[in-house]
């Protein structure tokens, strides 16, 4: 397999404290930072209520047997408008006016101040659509499986105590889940009537090509099926899921600030009169009255028409940005929470493309000038219809083409190629063989058997994650945040019952009146920043330790283990992040670690866990020691070995065997039955 050269990332961000891009000892800077902090708080308040109101609106549609429409930027814009105090400007017409009225009818919240936030809220609207659609596209099939599991666990809750019954039940309901997702009927006959009754409540009856394809094309038609499953789980009093994302965290979140947002927030017509004269070159004259013919005063509104020409001057007025990135230019956009900020850089290869987009957008706006609202709406609707038709045409053209499997798509340019996907010449040299895990993040060994373990305890100590958690918990307990948040535990944010969700919203918004001012304390954002810095430093230290133990010239062969879902009662641990960090310094190749943990590297027989009794344990029960494996030695005596060392030795064995023969050892292949 020949590796293709990766195209450059379009954007790159540089994260740093916002204080590092501010002019020093400047009173205006302090005033502007106060404006920015208030804008962040106001934006968070608006978006929190918008999520709540949108979810409530969707539930009203469902319970009134109305079709749940596609959620667009217009939908979110009207939802936000219903939450904000009235502002001057053109009133919504047509479909937008109907949407606004719908939201106002169900809105019971206090109104928020949305002045000078239009650009920031536009970005948030896009973020919200992404969050809503991703929740459907990426989690729907997991929710279907969870629903089927919960339903039949409840149905057979008495018999499920029997291990054999439980094993057989899971085997049978796996077929039921596959039948629902693939629209087949291969499960046991006893499930047919249930499937016939519930299938099209769980998934749509009409779909295009397959459910996996259809959900990518039309995600919103799956919302009602998610609500149905939630309501059924509520009836059974089983754990539900969140069919619609909401914003519950009261810590100030990041906002995106571009040139337009900068002008909206910081430029004042009177205060910056001289600057406006410099920035705005076009002269406008008064066309009537006694001052006819005299130059018009330049305003903040005039500046919006020439942002592109003046963006560098505008940013230099308010921020001291001197940071650079090789082959990248500053994109005049920052993402900030008021303490930390990310400067966005655009790759030089994409500058022309982005400029063309802006010119096209500007030309489109110019073409709409002077048209009535109805004419503008018709043009927009025609454009949407044309895009839909073109997308449908493309789908039909691609329908007959042979489809690549996900595996084939990945193989074309994998992030971490497997050892059998690259020429053997690329694997020649010195090797570090790594067995990834939870307790020991990386257990590694070189060709000579030199062993090193990078543990989760080392990672936690260096990142200070537990220390910051404890400090914040103590602080929250002391100022009363914990007590208020515990009071919300009696409400269910996942409920699909309108009355109960309305109760939750009312309680949460009331709690936020106290929580939001408390969470504005910089300490919360500070520790978030410190965690980020420590994480980056820890990753660098990890690589330095590996280089010191071995060398930069080694090739890494790493097991393809991944946890999939977070284990209960075990702290979350990094895997892919650290793997990518290794790739910055080393060549990294995956190896299929099938059976490398359960077979003894010496005898190739199945290992068992060691069980021991502890003197301090009064019950004298034998306890499993997960980190130690036992195996039968050749002299029929029992031997012990560290699980991680055994894994590394097995990976070495499989790798060396592959280099010699191009195959896997027989007992480590999936065809061999143990």
Model-identified regions with their sequence ranges:
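Positively charged, helix-rich recognition surfaces that bind polyanionic ligands
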Residues: 2-674
């Amino acid at each position: 397999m020949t590796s293709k050269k990766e195209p450059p990332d379009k954007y790159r961000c540089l994260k740093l404290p916002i204080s590092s891009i501010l002019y020093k000892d400047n009173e205006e800077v302090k005033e502007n930072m106060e404006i920015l902090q208030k804008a962040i708080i106001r934006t968070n308040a608006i978006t929190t209520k918008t999520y709540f109101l949108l979810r409530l609106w969707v539930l009203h549609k469902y319970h009134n047997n109305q079709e749940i429409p596609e959620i667009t930027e217009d939908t979110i814009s009207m939802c936000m408008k219903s939450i904000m105090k009235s502002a001057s400007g053109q009133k919504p017409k047509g479909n937008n006016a109907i949407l606004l009225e719908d939201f106002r009818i169900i809105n019971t919240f206090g109104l928020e101040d949305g002045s000078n936030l239009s650009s920031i809220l536009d970005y948030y609207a896009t973020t919200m659509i992404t969050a809503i659609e991703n929740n459907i596209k990426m989690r729907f099939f997991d929710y279907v499986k969870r629903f089927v599991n919960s339903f039949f666990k409840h149905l057979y809750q008495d018999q499920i105590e029997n291990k054999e019954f439980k094993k057989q039940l899971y085997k049978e309901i796996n077929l039921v889940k596959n039948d629902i997702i693939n629209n087949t009927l291969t499960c046991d006959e006893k499930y047919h009537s249930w499937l016939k009754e519930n299938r099209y409540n769980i998934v749509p009856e009409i779909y295009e090509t397959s459910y996996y394809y259809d959900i990518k094309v039309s995600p919103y038609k799956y919302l009602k099926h998610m609500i149905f499953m939630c309501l059924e789980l509520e009836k059974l009093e089983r754990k539900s899921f969140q069919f619609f994302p909401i914003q519950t965290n009261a810590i100030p979140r990041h906002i995106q600030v571009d040139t337009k947002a900068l002008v909206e927030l910081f430029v004042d017509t009177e205060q910056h009169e001289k600057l406006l004269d410099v920035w705005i070159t076009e002269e406008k004259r008064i066309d009537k009255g006694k001052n006819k013919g005299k130059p018009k005063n330049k305003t903040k509104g005039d500046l919006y028409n020439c942002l592109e020409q003046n963006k560098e001057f505008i940013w230099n007025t308010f921020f001291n940005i001197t940071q650079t990135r090789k082959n990248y230019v500053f994109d005049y956009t920052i993402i900030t929470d008021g303490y930390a900020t990310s400067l966005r850089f655009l790759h030089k290869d994409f500058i022309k493309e982005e400029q063309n987009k802006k010119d096209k957008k500007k030309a489109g706006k110019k073409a709409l000038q002077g048209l009535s609202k109805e004419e503008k709406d018709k043009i927009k609707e025609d454009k949407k219809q044309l895009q839909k038709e073109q997308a449908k045409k493309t789908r039909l053209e691609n329908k007959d083409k042979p489809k690549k499997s996900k595996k084939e798509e990945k193989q074309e340019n994998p992030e971490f190629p497997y050892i059998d996907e690259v020429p053997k010449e690329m694997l020649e040299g010195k090797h570090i063989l790594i067995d990834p895990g939870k307790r020991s993040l990386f257990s590694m060994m070189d060709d000579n058997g030199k062993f090193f373990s990078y543990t989760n305890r080392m990672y936690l100590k260096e990142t200070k994650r537990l220390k910051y958690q404890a400090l914040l918990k103590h602080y929250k307990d002391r100022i009363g945040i914990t007590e208020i948040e515990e009071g919300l535990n009696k409400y269910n944010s996942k409920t699909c019952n309108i009355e109960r969700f309305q109760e939750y919203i009312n309680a949460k918004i009331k709690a936020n009146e106290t929580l939001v001012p408390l969470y504005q304390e910089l300490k919360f954002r500070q520790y978030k920043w410190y965690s980020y810095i420590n994480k980056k430093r820890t990753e660098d230290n990890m690589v330095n330790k590996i280089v010191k133990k071995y060398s930069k010239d080694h090739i890494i062969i790493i097991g393809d283990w991944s946890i999939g879902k977070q284990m209960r009662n075990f702290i979350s641990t990094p895997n892919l992040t650290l793997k990518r960090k290794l790739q910055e310094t080393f060549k990294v190749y995956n190896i299929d670690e099938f059976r490398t943990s359960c077979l003894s590297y010496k005898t190739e027989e199945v290992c068992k866990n060691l069980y021991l009794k502890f003197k301090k344990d009064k019950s004298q029960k034998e306890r499993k020691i997960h980190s130690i494996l036992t195996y039968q030695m050749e002299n029929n005596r029992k031997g012990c070995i560290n699980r991680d060392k055994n894994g590394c030795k097995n990976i070495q064995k499989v790798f060396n065997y592959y280099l010699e023969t191009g195959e896997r050892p027989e007992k480590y292949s999936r065809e061999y039955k143990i």
